[in-house]
Amino acid sequence: ARNDFFRRELRAILKEYGNHPSFLLYCNGNELEGDFDFLNELTEYGRSHDNRRLFSGSTARKHVKAEQFYVSHRSDKGGVTIYEGRPMTDWDINAGHGTGQPIISHETGQRCVYPDFREIPAYTGPVEARNLERYRDSLAAHGMEHLAADFFRVSGQQTRIEYKDVIEGQLRSSLSSGFQLLSLIDFPGQGYAPVGILNAFWKSKGIITPEKFREFCAPSVALLRFQKRAFFNDEIFSGKAELYNYSPSRFRRPDVRWHVTDSRGTTLYSGRISCK
C-alpha cells in the first residue's frame, strides 16, 4: 500500500506539473534513507510515464541504476562539492565529474553567518526566535554583547568571500553539470543553519548586493586562474583568463577588456585579452 501511494503521488506530480517549462529534473527526495531497490523501481516507473525530463533516485545517497543524473557531494571519482576556497584559483573539480553521467554538486558552500539579533522583533507570529534569543543571552553572559554587530558583519564578509570562491570553482569545472546551494536564506528548522545571504524572512542581511553577487553567479561570468594571491613587489603576476558562458547566445566580441584598480578605484593598468 505504501509503495502504491508513492506511485500515485509520482503520477500526480507528472500530470500536474508535466508541462511546466522549468520542470527539467525530477528527484524522489533529498538525502533519502530506506529501500533503495524500491527507489530504483520508482525512478524507472517515472521514466516509463514521462520521457520529457531526467530522473534521479535521491540526492547525496546511493546511486540507483535507473537514474539519469546524480546530485551528491562526491562521486566514485572524487569530491564534487566545494565548501571553501583556496590560496589560489588555478584549480577545479573536473576529476570528480568524470563518470559519464551528469552530476550536480550538492549543497555547495554552507557558510554560517553569526546571528543578527536585530531580526528578533520580526518574529510576531506563532514562531518565536528562541534560538536567536539563546545566542543573544549567551553572548551577554560572556560579557561580549557589545561585539554582536561586529561578529555579524565580519562573519558575513567571510561568507561573501567564501561563496565567491566556491562558486567560481564550480564554474571553472567544465565537466560539472551544475551546483546547488543549501539555501540563499537562513534555514530556521531542523537545527538552526544561518547559511543565507538573506535572512529567514527573505530580507537582505546587507552582506552583498544582487549586482555584486551576479558578478560571480550568473549565466556569464569572467574567471581568472592564478597560482597565489600574495606577491612581493619584485614578482610578476601571471594568470589565465576564462569565460563561463551558459547564456542563450554566444559572445560576438572576440576581445575582453581588463583593468586593475587600487583601493580608491583609480585605474592602474588596463588592456585587452584576445579570446580563443
Where in this protein do the model-derived segments appear?
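Substrate-binding/catalytic cleft of secreted carbohydrate-active enzymes
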Residues: 1-198
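Carbohydrate-binding surfaces of carbohydrate-active enzymes
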Residues: 126-276
